[in-house]
Every structure is written in structure tokens, then in C-alpha cells.
UniProtKB/Swiss-Prot annotation:
Full protein name: Urease subunit beta
Subcellular location: Cytoplasm
One annotated Gene Ontology cellular component of this protein: urease complex
Domain of life: Bacteria
The species this protein was found in: Janthinobacterium sp. (strain Marseille)
Keyword check for Hydrolase: yes
Record keyword Cytoplasm present: yes
MF annotations from Gene Ontology: urease activity
Pfam family, one: Urease_beta
């Protein structure tokens, strides 16, 4: 192997196969651009982004890791969200969840 060399299998890589998705219309009501990263809990995004927050609960943008979507002031666009995976625990962001997304009875 040569330093920096990448050995890549032929074909396409499908992201987030089998995960629940949702489509939501989002509008930036603020006076500044807002950028949302690929793994940000969409429910907790900037309050100037107007959309049905219930749809964004437990979801993130369905985009490639490490990328982001920018919402310009006054812009409205439709985005696809995908369910967070793993343990489905959310900490940080804007502190609105701070624990398990799926609350179980008796816990």
C-alpha cells in the first residue's frame, strides 16, 4: 500500500438504508443564515427555523456525514430527515432532551 492510497470497492454506498425518514418544510424566519450539520438533533435547531418540531424529534438531516445544509434568511426549503440510530440518547445540543429519546414505561 502507498501512503495515502485508498482502496475502494466498486459500486455505490447506500446511506441510512432501512431507517425511518420524514420530509419537512423549513423556513428561516431570522435575519441571518443558519447552518445545520449532518448529525445535529433537528428538533433542537435554532428557533428561527420554523417547521413542525414534532417531526424533527429524534431525527437528523439525511445527508452525508460531515456536511451541512444552510438556510438563508427568508428561505424556505423541504428537507429529508432520518431517525437517529444507536442507543437513541441525546445530550447537549440545546439541552431539550438530555437523555433517552424513547422513554420506556417504568424507567
Amino acid at each position: 500500500m502507498i501512503p495515502g492510497e485508498m482502496l475502494v470497492e466498486p459500486g455505490d454506498i447506500e446511506l441510512n438504508v432501512g431507517r425511518a425518514t420524514a420530509t419537512v418544510k423549513v423556513a428561516n424566519s431570522g435575519d441571518r443564515p443558519i447552518q445545520v450539520g449532518s448529525h445535529f438533533h433537528f428538533y433542537e435547531t435554532n428557533p428561527a427555523l420554523k417547521f413542525d418540531r414534532a417531526i424533527g424529534y429524534g431525527m437528523r438531516l439525511n445527508i452525508t456525514a460531515g456536511t451541512a445544509v444552510r438556510f438563508e434568511p427568508g428561505q424556505e426549503r423541504t428537507v429529508e430527515l432520518v431517525a437517529l440510530a444507536g442507543d437513541r440518547k441525546v445530550y447537549g445540543f440545546n439541552g431539550k432532551v438530555m437523555g433517552a429519546l424513547d422513554k420506556k414505561e417504568g424507567k
